Amino acid sequence: MQIKTFALSAAIAQVATLALADTSANYWQSFTSQINPKNISIPSIEQTSSIDPTQECAYYTPDASLFTFNASEWPSIWEVATTNGMNESAEFLSVYNSIDWTKAPNISVRTLDANGNLDTTGYNTATDPDCWWTATTCTSPKISDINDDISKCPEPETWGLTYDDGPNCSHNAFYDYLQEQKLKASMFYIGSNVVDWPYGAMRGVVDGHHIASHTWSHPQMTTKTNQEVLAEFYYTQKAIKLATGLTPRYWRPPYGDIDDRVRWIASQLGLTAVIWNLDTDDWSAGVTTTVEAVEQSYSDYIAMGTNGTFANSGNIVLTHEINTTMSLAVENLPKIISAYKQVIDVATCYNISHPYFEDYEWTNVLNGTKSSATASGSATSASASGGATTAAAHIQASTSGAMSVLPNLALISAFIATLLF
């Protein structure tokens, strides 16, 4: 029955992907890109080949045959996505006006308290009318026609490998290590980082990672107006398409801050949220907490791979692609691989065959990651561990320096029935 349960979850995920395809006049088809995602050739320059952060993070002008960025057509980098007049541009207004805003949930824009934290004062956490994750960690919307957030991998003893905030200019050693270990992750890219470091985004696709959206400027999304929320989504989608030739169907809210208003707006662009059920808090190491505390979180979560915690389903773990966290990831990945049967990206763990709007089929498979990434025999295991140590040392230096078709519902029902019975 466990196999059937997973198969059902995967089937539902695939159906949901298809069901959200025809939204807002297929806005993504208006995006342009000079990139063929099935055949990307990244220029060999110091920034793409070096593992010295100083060289990696030196500004470069992208090859015009691959990536052309006209600043007048984009929001200001790292500012809310309606800046630079984008909320008044014909391009954005075309998408905004294609949405029937009378159907949007009547949920107020959230505010911050004096300390800059989301103010949950007065919110009814018992009834949680808005499915506000920040207040209650709710992942099942209270309104219809919106997908549930994805928050865990359905397959038992599975580590859902995800990294936020990329592409980071100093990620070469980290991506090299993932490639050596044949590990694929869900990479949640920030639009501003994509246009700053387009070759980094291209590498994510070349290496076979699942690319998803993490907004344009990394705001607390429930504090933004409807226009601002839509713009954060829209321009991140446009940026990822420009740099990679692909438009994601999945996104992750910064800080996990999402409610049914934000979900509804995301759904108008065919986007489904991916949350997590374990948080390493890795970004805070040496900032608001100690490195030792983050290492303990890793150790606790690694132990869960063998102590029965995930005997019936897996996890999705929040980690980050930033200067202070990539070395922690590399140090812990060999132990994660040893403790879990699967270490895989979200698209694979949910058996999502088309994680992008374009005709680009996902071919990563269950059980493929660990068998190829885990050493068989003590000698090879030692080699894998050594590789982790070497990569971590390099990364540590940076801390100091398609056409979519709606499914036939009768066929879907019949298929799910065969899984259940």
UniProtKB/Swiss-Prot annotation:
It is a lipid-anchor; GPI-anchor. It catalyses: [(1->4)-N-acetyl-beta-D-glucosaminyl](n) + n H2O = chitosan + n acetate. Glycans are attached at N39, N70, N87, N106, N168, N307, N323, N351, N367. Its main location: secreted. GO terms for molecular function: chitin binding; chitin deacetylase activity; metal ion binding. Its EC number is 3.5.1.41. Keywords: Carbohydrate metabolism, Cell membrane, Cell wall, Cell wall biogenesis/degradation, Chitin degradation, Chitin-binding, Cobalt, Glycoprotein, GPI-anchor, Hydrolase, Lipoprotein, Membrane, Metal-binding, Polysaccharide degradation, Secreted, Signal. Transmembrane segments: none annotated. It is found in: Secreted, Cell wall; Cell membrane. It holds the Pfam family Polysacc_deac_1. Co(2+) binds at D165, H214, H218. Coiled coil: none annotated. Residues 157-349 form the NodB homology domain. Residues 391-421 form a propeptide. Acetate binds at D164, Y255. One of its GO terms (cellular component) is plasma membrane. GO terms for biological process: cell wall organization; chitin catabolic process; fungal-type cell wall biogenesis; polysaccharide catabolic process. Its cofactor is Co(2+). Residues 1-21 form the signal peptide. A lipid is attached at T390 (GPI-anchor amidated threonine). The active site is at D164, H320. InterPro entries: Glyco_hydro/deAcase_b/a-brl, NODB_dom, Polysacc_deacetylase_ArnD. Hydrolyzes the N-acetamido groups of N-acetyl-D-glucosamine residues in chitin to form chitosan and acetate. This is Chitin deacetylase. The gene is CDA.
